[in-house]
Amino acid sequence: MASRRTKSPDQIVSLRETLVSAGLEPRLADLLDAMPHRLIQVEPRRPFREPGAPRSEVMFVRSGILAKFKPDASGGRQIVALRFPGEGILPGKAPAHYGIQAIVRSQVMVGEARDFTALVEQHPAMRQFFCRLLQRNEDIGYEWLVNCGRRDATSRVAHLLCETAVRMNRGDGGLANPFTQQQIADMTGQTSVNVNRVLADMERQGLIRRKGREIEFVDWAEMRRIGSFQPAYLEI
């Protein structure tokens, strides 16, 4: 689920509008929009769902950003996926092998898996739609794997910033950076000290300009080149 409107993490997006914009028939979007759900405000200070929790819910991010994370034995963690406004987390049969935590204060629609599954099973077009969403999430996961496994520190951060700008529909102008340097480190497999150095180097090289949390892409084409960023994998 991904709306094409420009959005910031604190902007509330509509489930129905997002589904229709992504290609689902309006009548099917209406069924999902009418499904029983709770609206939950998720604070970023502690996990929303711990690793090993049942995947008995379907989630839709109305505002904010959710992160999936994997802890390690030393107490550290790797952020392995993000969900921006207009994106969601689908249920599954097995317990989750990841935790969920908000990057910023977020509003999340949470429904029961049994209600969601019943609708999907009744409507083949809905099933096909969510298969496409799962394929998109898988493609994003492959990009993240390559980013952490094969690219250098600067390329990793460049790719993350480019992807974030596109997923937030901010285009090539820049973005209000929603991440702390530690969060960027947890996403790109490096230390926060190294992330600070990379961002400073990007600014010195004339690639970006920073003012508070705002990051302006001074040279978008070069940022894309450095990060090997080709956005086709983000399409549904």
Segment roles from a protein language model:
Residues 121-189:
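Polybasic "coupling" helices that flank or enter modular domains
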Residues 1-44, 85-89:
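Cyclic nucleotide-binding regulatory module and flanking cytosolic helices
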Residues 39, 82, 110, 178, ...:
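Short aromatic/basic micro-patch
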Residues 53, 61, 112, 219, ...:
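Histidine- and aromatic-rich ligand-binding microenvironments
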Residues 79-139, 143:
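Cyclic-nucleotide recognition modules
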Residues 165-236:
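Phosphate-/nucleic-acid-contacting segments
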Residues 46-104:
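Cyclic nucleotide-binding regulatory domains
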